Amino acid sequence: MKHRIGRVETQIQREVDDILLKDVNDPRVKGVTITGVKLTGDLQHATIFYSILDDAPDKVEAAQTGLDKASGLIRREVGQRIRLFKVPEIEFAQDKSVQYGARIDQLINEVRRKNLE
């Protein structure tokens, strides 16, 4: 069962990324990248993680609002593209691991600079 959940998560990620590129015309979601999908064990709820290039708070909030507004369209399109008994409810969440990784890189570079001095 876990293998199936992983396959469905990957397929949903691929489809949502494609839907955002081709079908959603909202300028607030331009530059949004889908980084992962987490499904519940019963496949009823999906949390879709995204990152955005410009991580300014107002841009992140606008992207979240745009994704929330487009969630009905995205859910319908996912249901048409993927054969599932029931299409999961979709919730979007910002993926903070990208920011965390950038902060780690910044700290490593600072340590290297201090060691060179």
Curated annotation (Swiss-Prot):
| Record Pfam families | RBFA
Q: Which residues form a coiled coil?
A: none
Q: Which family does it belong to?
A: Belongs to the RbfA family.
The places in or outside the cell where this protein is found are:
Cytoplasm
Has the keyword Protein transport been applied to this entry? no
Organism, as annotated: Lacticaseibacillus paracasei (strain ATCC 334 / BCRC 17002 / CCUG 31169 / CIP 107868 / KCTC 3260 / NRRL B-441) (Lactobacillus paracasei)
Keywords assigned by UniProt, alphabetized: Cytoplasm, Ribosome biogenesis
* Job of this protein: One of several proteins that assist in the late maturation steps of the functional core of the 30S ribosomal subunit. Associates with free 30S ribosomal subunits (but not with 30S subunits that are part of 70S ribosomes or polysomes). Required for efficient processing of 16S rRNA. May interact with the 5'-terminal helix region of 16S rRNA.
Instruction: Report what the protein is called.
Output: Ribosome-binding factor A
For this protein, the record's HAMAP family field holds: RbfA
Q: Which GO terms describe its cellular component?
A: cytosol
**Which positions make up the signal peptide?**
none
